[in-house]
Swiss-Prot record:
It comes from Buchnera aphidicola subsp. Baizongia pistaciae (strain Bp). Its EC number is 7.1.1.-. NDH-1 shuttles electrons from NADH, via FMN and iron-sulfur (Fe-S) centers, to quinones in the respiratory chain. The immediate electron acceptor for the enzyme in this species is believed to be ubiquinone. Couples the redox reaction to proton translocation (for every two electrons transferred, four hydrogen ions are translocated across the cytoplasmic membrane), and thus conserves the redox energy in a proton gradient. The gene is nuoA. Gene3D superfamilies: NADH:ubiquinone/plastoquinone oxidoreductase, chain 3. PANTHER family: NADH-QUINONE OXIDOREDUCTASE SUBUNIT A, NADH-UBIQUINONE OXIDOREDUCTASE CHAIN 3. Keywords: Cell membrane, Membrane, NAD, Quinone, Translocase, Transmembrane, Transmembrane helix, Transport, Ubiquinone. Pfam families: Oxidored_q4. GO terms for molecular function: NADH dehydrogenase (ubiquinone) activity; NADH:ubiquinone reductase (non-electrogenic) activity; quinone binding. GO terms for cellular component: NADH dehydrogenase complex; plasma membrane. It catalyses: a quinone + NADH + 5 H(+)(in) = a quinol + NAD(+) + 4 H(+)(out). This is NADH-quinone oxidoreductase subunit A.
Length: 132
């Protein structure tokens, strides 16, 4: 048997899955293109808020600090999930698992120390003016 036919015989399920997934995507995109509306007017791209005409723009300033804190939260939360899974199976892991978890915690602490030392968790900026 040829090497390519052996590879095809081994991976037929993957190729079938890939073909079906691409076919479904192409089918859904083509159906939406065929059945979708083609009208264009000046009101087509305006936001619709319960029939009320918007009075100002929707652009608003949001500090990047909020996004950074959200990213840090997700990172440390996922790492906490890993630690929870480790703590549930601590009996099966033994000392090797304990040492691996200790190294993982040290990596977490080094990341937290980096965030604190680079002042990425400080909320006050130099330009803050407090009005009393």
């Amino acid at each position: 048997m040829l090497k390519s036919s052996v590879i095809a015989a081994q991976y037929w399920a993957f190729f079938t899955f890939f073909f079906i997934a691409v076919s479904i995507c192409v089918f859904m995109l083509s159906i939406s293109w065929i059945l979708g509306g083609r009208s264009s007017s000046r009101y087509k791209n305006t936001p619709f808020e319960s029939g009320i005409v918007p009075t100002n723009t929707t652009n608003m300033y949001c500090s990047v600090k909020f996004y950074l804190v959200a990213i840090y939260f997700v990172l440390f939360d996922v790492e906490a999930l890993y630690l929870y899974a480790w703590s549930v199976s601590i009996v099966e892991c033994g000392w090797i698992g304990f040492i691996e978890a200790l190294i993982f915690i040290l990596f977490l602490l080094s990341g937290l120390i980096y965030l604190i030392s680079s002042k990425l968790l400080v909320w006050k900026s130099k330009n803050n003016i407090h009005v009393t």
